[in-house]
Amino acid sequence: MQYDHILVRYGELTLKSGNRNTFINQLKSNIKYALIPLTGYKVNANRDRMYVEITEDADAEEIMKRISKVFGVHSVSPVVKVEKNIDQIKSSAVKLARDIDAPGVTFKVDAKRSDKGFPYDTFALQQELGGEILSNIEHLTVDVKNPDYKLLVEIRSDAAYLYSRVIKGAGGLPVGTGGKTLLMLSGGIDSPVAGIEVMKRGVTIEAIHFHSPPFTSEEAKQKVIDLTRIMAETTGEIKLHLVPFTDIQKMIHKKVPENLTMTSTRRMMLKIADRFARQIDAKALVNGENLGQVASQTLGSMYAINAVTNLPILRPLLTLDKDEIIIKAKEIGTFDTSIQPFEDCCTIFTPKNPKTNPRLDKVESFEAGTDFDAMIEEAVANIETLTISKHTNTKKEFEDLL
């Protein structure tokens, strides 16, 4: 069957009556971005649905695959659009049914009619189409309770639409409708997943990464660039901010007892992220912390670390099991990159016996003897920024940076 349109159903946008047009326009823009550089389509949107016209030579399957990954899309279907003429509708229904024709296969016609002026009511239309299919196709039988396939027909104001497939979308809200956050992006499994999870709620992210050459390698930096590109595949450009962290990290290990260095390191990172977030007008920080997963992610550690900022910290992975996070990482395509064996600055100086319940007053007293604020200001001033998109040649970006 040659389809001529792809039907895109909105998710939670239907609940946003006051801002619906803003959400729809953003979703339309995001879908157009996701479809680059494909050809043979035209995106049309209204308050209830979005229809993507496709030409005969368009790659319909690839178009649907890409659209289904865009946040804000509830589901997609390849559809045939015909005039609201019963004979044309019958003819198209039979053609659709031939695609599923096989011995023992059952079907059901499910009709919806938003155009109440159409001469057939829902029940009558279902009977007409079901009878036409049974008269023309040998093997199919009707099962209204548990069919193998549903043939769906929508009678709308402009035309009739027929389809038999419904492909689940990514859900959530369109990226760009929920404000800006700053993602603390390591090279590990968790933080890219956290970034995707908040983007699903319509939030735009910029990412900040701490690197400590020569203790961290250039390959570790490249890995973070690659992770950013993967996250940007369906959401548009993402700015990646690279923080020189070597001097601060060396000073921490010189001035702070070993079992508190992890806590102090995280505090300095958070101070830098806090200051930079305010510069770019980000309203919250995001990280991949998971309660109890490591020493720095116990409640006691979080309390001591969080004391340096009053910005909201979003932790979308807080209560997930590691296996659940890994599944999500594989689904979004970051897992294989995340497990590349290049250490980041969080792992190179890991103490043997880190404090899991550090006292805030003790951490502050050890830090007070050093002018970390001046070092933080210098680190923020020397941040390097890359703008990454799915079209970015990340290897070239990396070489240009060097």
UniProtKB/Swiss-Prot annotation:
Q: Which Gene3D superfamilies match?
A: 3.30.2130.30, HUPs
Q: What Gene Ontology cellular-component terms does the record carry?
A: cytosol
Q: What is its EC number?
A: 2.8.1.4
Positions that bind ATP? 184-185, 209-210, 266, 288, 297
Single GO BP term: thiamine biosynthetic process
Catalysed reactions, as listed in the record: [ThiI sulfur-carrier protein]-S-sulfanyl-L-cysteine + a uridine in tRNA + 2 reduced [2Fe-2S]-[ferredoxin] + ATP + H(+) = [ThiI sulfur-carrier protein]-L-cysteine + a 4-thiouridine in tRNA + 2 oxidized [2Fe-2S]-[ferredoxin] + AMP + diphosphate; [ThiS sulfur-carrier protein]-C-terminal Gly-Gly-AMP + S-sulfanyl-L-cysteinyl-[cysteine desulfurase] + AH2 = [ThiS sulfur-carrier protein]-C-terminal-Gly-aminoethanethioate + L-cysteinyl-[cysteine desulfurase] + A + AMP + 2 H(+)
Question: Into which family does the record put it?
Answer: Belongs to the ThiI family.
Q: What does this protein do?
A: Catalyzes the ATP-dependent transfer of a sulfur to tRNA to produce 4-thiouridine in position 8 of tRNAs, which functions as a near-UV photosensor. Also catalyzes the transfer of sulfur to the sulfur carrier protein ThiS, forming ThiS-thiocarboxylate. This is a step in the synthesis of thiazole, in the thiamine biosynthesis pathway. The sulfur is donated as persulfide by IscS.
Protein known as? Probable tRNA sulfurtransferase
State the species of origin. Macrococcus caseolyticus (strain JCSC5402)
